[in-house]
């Protein structure tokens, strides 16, 4: 439910009605009919001129038959009491262990219908006939001023699949954009970070309506999938928990048809649409994550990837050109990470963790598409095994037991360590085996690669790896082999 402000905060009869009809549920017996009408007061400006050259954090995807565009969307969104790091002015103001464990999803209205203007970054096929009908929606991560972490990791797969992608700018990043180009972004505004939720609702409904003001007008939009990683994984899980039932199309249908929150430890409640969660070995047991696991059910899958760390390796470069302006100042209240400082905690001989998490992420999206389009249930998987104190149980090589097991840990030539302290646990490392150890385990490079290929083939048959991923995984293993 949504709760009104305490007395003395200016709650008028109009605001009470707004709280019941447009921002929450059942206050004073008013039925839950939340954000269900047309976004009549949403205004769209764009596409902005020359987005590839002028838009910070915008990729050039022309060589892949796609186009990049920016839009400014204005509307009205409630200011609410924050419920997670994703809508707080500072992540340090939140108790994430408590936030992630919440099972009672109340909202507390502070001020209704405050104006906002946000930026949408849109990637879409130039040829409408190649559009899949699917739109991936991701909150842009405040770190670095607004990065699409799933776009960065999986854009090759999205474009090969014909998907459109929309990144919604987080309110915390508006000052950096205005400072970068005041003429272009001077109208960006927000009263409070909690307006993010209204921005996501308006953007989703705008795209799904498909009317002339939509950034995807003329595209036959069928499904919207919300995803995110790390901070924006929290945003995805938070939206699913608090807003999925409250955010509706004019006819009462869902705005979002699926959720894929990744690299966050947050509980996600049962919904009427499919949900897939992913946690790396860095994330599965942090912030109370072990208590926020939920058994698979007909609309839910939970994956934990042994050996993978939170700060994941980038995929190989493709024809997409990274942004000309690749970073803006990170807002205050966000963590400041130093890879160099964390590497000093790694043991002798360790190098950065290079686990190809993007390959498993591709399989998640492929399985979600089959689930939505053909009703094909995704595979189940085991949890990472734990000791009595909640740490990952390790095998004889020092790698985690259980979970989704890629050849990095099932046919290992390195130890994948996720045991640094503090924030450095997000980075992870690997300690390559000596040549002597590799030869003792596998005999020869050829025997090792044959075992990797068999392991990758099993993963593909289990649908935990895409078919094209088999050869890619074998090539990665070949580069790592020390024989």
Predicted feature residues:
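Generic low-complexity segments that are intrinsically disordered, proline-rich and/or Lys/Arg-biased
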Residues: 5-6, 32, 39
